[in-house]
């Protein structure tokens, strides 16, 4: 989520990020970077003693992931109650971007109560299944090939297979039109 928020800021968009941060050097870095690019963290929370979510990606010579290590435990603090307390703010957004590092119950609660359009990033094949019950509540989805295969049930071996996978995703109730699958 932070990478998407960061890049939207760089594109000149007004962005607020609702998240949780730990009490560590990574959180300080996130706050400093957010200030530098104009990313609003007003509706975020600091978890006493918490470790800010981290993700390390190691690419091979071909650019594909060879290894990834993460610590996302802090996102368990983004509960339905955490979201409920911020829902008025969230519902006034032009677009809500969420991802599957959130607990499944929180993702489902958000999708049931959010009146703003929602774009979801599956983030990984391990976490993508959390989106299956809420696909019909989403406005847009940002899967990679493997995540699209998992959520659509369609094997994508060539570029010609992608439209069939997109159709299957739209049949799940994904809102809007063909442009919803980005």
Where do the model's predicted regions map?
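Histidine-anchored nucleotide/phosphate-binding helix
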Residues: 2-10
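Conserved N-terminal subdomain of the carbohydrate kinase-like
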Residues: 10-94
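Short, well-ordered alpha-helical microsegments
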Residues: 27, 104-108, 127-131
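Short, small-residue-enriched loops and turns at beta-alpha junctions
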Residues: 73-77, 104, 125-128, 150
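Structural motif
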Residues: 94-95, 140
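Catalytic beta/alpha-barrel core
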Residues: 97-102, 121-122
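Conserved phosphate/ATP/ADP-binding segment of small-molecule kinases
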Residues: 113-118, 122-182
């Amino acid at each position: 989520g932070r990478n998407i928020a960061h890049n939207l800021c760089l594109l000149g968009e007004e962005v607020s990020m609702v998240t949780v941060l730990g009490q560590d050097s990574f959180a300080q870095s996130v706050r400093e970077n957010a200030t530098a690019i104009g990313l609003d963290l007003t509706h975020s929370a600091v978890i006493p003693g918490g470790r800010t979510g981290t993700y390390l990606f190691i690419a091979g010579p071909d650019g594909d992931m060879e290894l990834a290590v993460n610590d996302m435990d802090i996102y368990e603090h983004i509960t339905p109650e955490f979201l409920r307390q911020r829902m008025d703010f969230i519902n006034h957004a032009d677009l809500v971007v969420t991802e599957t590092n959130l607990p499944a119950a929180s993702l489902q609660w958000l999708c049931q109560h959010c009146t703003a359009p929602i774009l979801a990033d599956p983030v990984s094949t391990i976490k993508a299944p959390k989106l299956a019950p809420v696909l019909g509540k989403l406005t847009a989805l940002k899967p990679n090939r493997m995540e699209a295969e998992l959520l659509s049930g369609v094997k994508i071996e060539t570029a010609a297979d992608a439209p069939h996978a997109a159709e299957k995703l739209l049949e799940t109730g994904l809102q809007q039109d063909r442009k919803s699958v980005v």
